UniProtKB/Swiss-Prot annotation:
One of its GO terms (biological process) is translation. The keyword Coiled coil does not apply. It holds the Pfam family Ribosomal_L35p. This is Large ribosomal subunit protein bL35. One of its GO terms (cellular component) is cytosolic large ribosomal subunit. Belongs to the bacterial ribosomal protein bL35 family. Keywords: Ribonucleoprotein, Ribosomal protein. The gene is rpmI. The lineage of its organism: Bacteria, Bacillati, Bacillota, Bacilli, Bacillales. The keyword Ribosomal protein applies. Residues 1-26 have a biased composition (Basic residues). Residues 1-42 are annotated as: Disordered. One of its GO terms (molecular function) is structural constituent of ribosome.
Length: 66
């Protein structure tokens, strides 16, 4: 049986925290900032934790990430 490969796109987008959760960045942060409020832009700066529903699938893609 061949080894499970890490999904490289996912490896660039997610980081594992010390407690084993997955950190991600927010969407809507690349352009068109004039249409967004200061409050919205400030909230988008912080990273977020992957939700429980997505965690299992993403964890499989990151099989070899420590």
């Amino acid at each position: 049986m061949p080894k499970m490969k890490t999904h490289r796109g996912s490896a660039k987008r997610f980081k594992k925290t010390g407690s084993g959760k997955l950190k991600r960045s927010h969407a809507y942060t690349s352009h068109l900032f004039a249409n967004k409020s200061t409050k919205q832009k400030r909230k988008l700066r912080k990273s977020a934790i992957v939700s429980a529903g997505d965690f299992k699938r993403i964890k499989q893609q990151l099989a070899n990430i420590k």
